[in-house]
């Protein structure tokens, strides 16, 4: 698509979908002026979560929009209402037609999305993944919130601590196809086999990234496994869902609850002693870093083979051999520290 046609299309988009960066060029254009000949091209970056209604990704979007305020870019934001790999592919196809400069996407299905992303690359569009990766040949860089090994081992070690290294536990995940969560589960199970012979993983249930379904699945698990000592929830809606199930069953404290989630969604359960630990990273920083990497790639500041990238307020971060930029180590939120955080 020609740039002039693309810009006319963007002008017609709803304001909720197009978030312009604040800069003099934009002001001139809004006043009826035009970009001066020879001025740098303004990048359009398309940003897609796994699902728009998930509080985790709402906070990712918040961080992305913070980066927009620092960068001379336009941001397109869209994604499925619920986790839907087919819808992600459809949105990518639309962005290919629009001719965006960079696509940044959290992949629901690692292999299922790779074809659409490869097509984007063939059309000259740069691709960055974040939170959950695709196949390496379908993107340039992956913005990783933490290593899969670090997350999986951290969850398993915390569950073992809470259960005094013995007893049955169950996992609630988002879907059985989520590539990042499958990676975490692999390391959870490896750590279990390596270090905790008196603990047993009895079941793994998907909740489709829905709190209500997570609550129902946790209720079912409590009924099916009367000796259950811990529910480990590895997607953000599942943590409060599992906590509510344990609370309503009158098993707070007897059945431990931990998982990956937002402190804001779990504060009450932590302070009541229903949930013992919430593990996460600073989610807004993940969205912020993703936009910084996408901008660096689209502008040419970041190239294949680079070992570091400048990431605004986060400073310079390392890039590993798998072309992954690591945000940092996970953090454990407890009733003692949860009030220090507002996301």
Segments and roles (model prediction):
Residues 29-36, 41, 176-180, 195-198, ...:
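Hinge/cleft segment of the Venus flytrap/periplasmic-binding protein
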Residues 110-150, 161, 168, 263-271, ...:
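Flexible loop/hinge segments that line or gate small-molecule binding clefts
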Residues 3-7:
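N-terminal export leaders
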Residues 88, 143-169, 213-215, 262-266, ...:
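Hydrophobic alpha-helical segments within soluble ligand-binding/sensing domains
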